[in-house]
Amino acid sequence: VIREVEILGKRPMKDIGVQQTRFDSLVLKENIALSMADILTFNSSIFVKSYGRATLSTVSFRGTSASHTQVTWNGMRINNPMLGMTDFSMIPSYFIDDASLLHGTSSVNMAGGGLGGLVKLSTVPAHQEGFGMQYVQGIGSFSTFDEFLQLKYGDKHWQISTRAVYQSSPNDYKYRNHDKKENIYDDKYNIIEQYYPIERNRSGAYKDLHILQEVYYNTGKGDRFGLNAWYTDSNRELALLTTDQGDLMDFENRQREHTLRSVLSWDHTRENWKVSARGGYVHTWLAYDYKRDLGNGIMATMTRSRSKVNTFYGQLDGEYFFSDKLLLTAGVSAHQHLVNSLDKDLNKDDNKNDKYGQGRKNDSIVYFDKGRIELSGNVSLKWQPVNRLGMSLVLRGEMFGTKWAPVIPAFFVDYVLSKRGNIMAKASITRNYRFPTLNDLYFLPGGNPALNNESGFTYETGLSFSVDKDNVYTLSGSASWFDQHINDWIIWLPTSKGFYSPVNLKKVHAYGVEVQADYAVAIDKAWKLGLNGTFAWTPSINEGEPTSKADQSVGKQLPYIPEYSATLSGRLTYRSWGLLYKWCYYSERYTMTSNAVSYTGHLPPYLMSNVTLEKGFSLRWADLSLKGTVNNLFDEEYLSVLSRPMPGINFEFFIGITPKWGKKKK
């Protein structure tokens, strides 16, 4: 007889009323070719907007924009201060040990400005005894190569780890170009048929190197010191649009990035209190070059853009338990951004030539050199008067530059409706603010220093449950409803002067439902099955006033935000064999504020399927793994962004080796 077990463990005080999604380590370490953009696409309800394979990928929660998503790495915010967003294609999933999503109001516990939510990324000590090593080699379609190496050492006090990922590919996949038509003629040159040509992705090559160094020291007396340093060297061509004409040899379209992120940490833990201090530094150098052959065989630079970002970071946090029912937390953080951006548009004029005989009379040079300090402080009180009931009050204050936002309050409550099945009801309410980014204010041309801060109220309620039967199965799930009214939403729109400029929309109403479920079962001693699914309904409607008589955006869904999204993944294991299937779906997205259903005004819905087969071998001297993956299993033709081609069916193969040196991992 299988005995049913009631699960009602004492939940962490920090999680009272919080809507959070945590990713399993199996998901994060699926294969070395994946970025966090891939992880979020197939394992969460948030929307990932990708400009192509190995190109810019941003995420947005609950019908908000990418700049409404805050991202932290080991406690330090890593959103680009110029753009306000994060490129998740540049974050290897093998560099992340712990990842979670804080939805909506829950993000206020970590940072302000996350009108949609917050992505929390971190690394953790490996708990290694002695020396350890892991090497993985991957090879895939389009001459793609992926390599991963990790070296580890650990003892009673020290944990040291070095990880490196190198990825490269010509990235010249084939696709059907629906933006062009080829004609078939008869003998009299009459058009008798037309077809969409098969083309290759042009100017899409990339070479990315990531190195992560970690050092941890644990005194064994309640103190732990840590150093995390992550270096990125990226060289990526920017693929031509499906509408671009001309020969590939006539263009060079390239983006380069060098970024160093580093965090020093100290954690001091006692029985009923804890103090943490962190200091960090981020340096980013970005370069964009667009060159074109003018017909004389010399590649002339048309656009040359250089940006440097230096960020200094400090944070201090404290926790104090008055009792097992009452917790006080407080924290303060500072980010000092120094940004230098220089753009040159090099125009040609025959009346004034340089040494190559190319004109420079009408060169256009625009730049800005700005600094801004961002301060944030918070205090929270979490109270659990009885085991079933928990309440949390959070107050947060923020200053950007010399401007203070009004106090950001948030209130959370949860209540266990039934111990049987651990059925819990949650509710929360918060006010939130987001300051304009540096590009919003100062970018030339188009920056708007007169922008207002975005502000709004968010309401949320939901249910969750979890059941278990003695090592046989676990079943858990949650459903939540949210309603968010945002004033002065910032959006970049075209102007009559020929460039884009940000403006404030008077009011946006984002609301909807999120559902998530997980199921794991041990069929017998050898067979195991795990299932995970998510669904989101996220209308995001412009409810402001028309800006002109021709404005057709009022009452319409905001651009590039799907109303529906869903994911499903299943993992079946038999001894050392593993089979993984992943599926995701995004509904129709509009490219215009008017929601015009024209050829270029909307992107059709699409679904994606990937499948992976894996086999592990345990030898006397090493553990080996072989893994094969099929991406886009059904060869779906789709677009995530207008005129940005995406790959069809493609394949990857990985071989991994972990030598058995010294003691095994605990």
Residue ranges and their predicted role:
Residues A37-N80:
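Extracytoplasmic beta-strand/coil segments of soluble accessory domains associated
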Residues M82, F95-D97, V108-E182, A205-I211:
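Outer-membrane beta-barrel translocator/receptor signature
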Residues Y216-S234, Q255-W404, K419, G477-W481, ...:
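Face-selective signature of the C-terminal outer-membrane beta-barrel domain
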Residues Q384-L389, S480-H485, N504-T591, K663:
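Gram-negative outer-membrane beta-barrel transporters
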